[in-house]
Amino acid sequence: GIFRAYEAEVVQSPIDADGVIPQALEETFTRLEREGRKVKFFYTIPNYHNPAGVCISEERRPQIVEICKRHHVLIVEDNPYGLLGFDGRTYTSFKSLAPDHVLYLGSVSKIFAPGYRVGWACAPSAMCEKLKLASESAILCPTSMGQYSISMYLSEFDWRNQISTFRGMYRSRRDAMIQALNDYLPMCQWNVPEGGFYTWVKLPQGLDAKDMLPRAVTNLVAYVSGTAFYANGEGRDHMRLSYCYPNEQDIREGVRRISEVVNRDLELVSLFG
């Protein structure tokens, strides 16, 4: 993705239902240090993760901060979905736990309007000047109209109530997604996200989401193969489904179309292995 575009070497660390696993993160840092590979930063989406939909538990957050401090690794906390918990819950930010050790990123594209490519960064003071220079070289200048529109919206409208409206809408669409998965893809496994945009679906053994995608597109439905979210080529047995844009009826129809492709591929696997 974006990191590879800048020729970064990306190394992944495992997660589970409670997010990043502290012990595994420590082991990853230690292994890389032993190999003489300097870790530049630790990037994470701690809340309603894309694509897994999980949140790092409150218990793990201070542990992760201490591990990163101990190994002198900056935390890049990307939090575009943090206000989209369906029950209104918010989590302790890494930034609040270690202000001088965290670069915090936010965006209006997920909570107001995706067409406004406006975001913000809260950086340690020592990084601010370098961050401004990097931003100027990468994007020259964000759209003035977009920034002005968002500024007016935040100052003159009830944006908190609008986010609450979005939460209710996304919860309903999440429910439609889960019901459709139960009805059409009972042979698969999935999480039930408590916020954000995505459901992470595991396919039955023998199926390949990346290989299956062209057949899904032919059936007028699409998803993102799990391989897009791994640094090492894994994830062929997973697909990311998004419920943020389509309405409940379209979500159900989309899952039904995916199920047709899955069932056809399962038949081929049973016949030919």
Where would I find each of the regions flagged by the language model?
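PLP-dependent class I/II
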Residues: 1-273
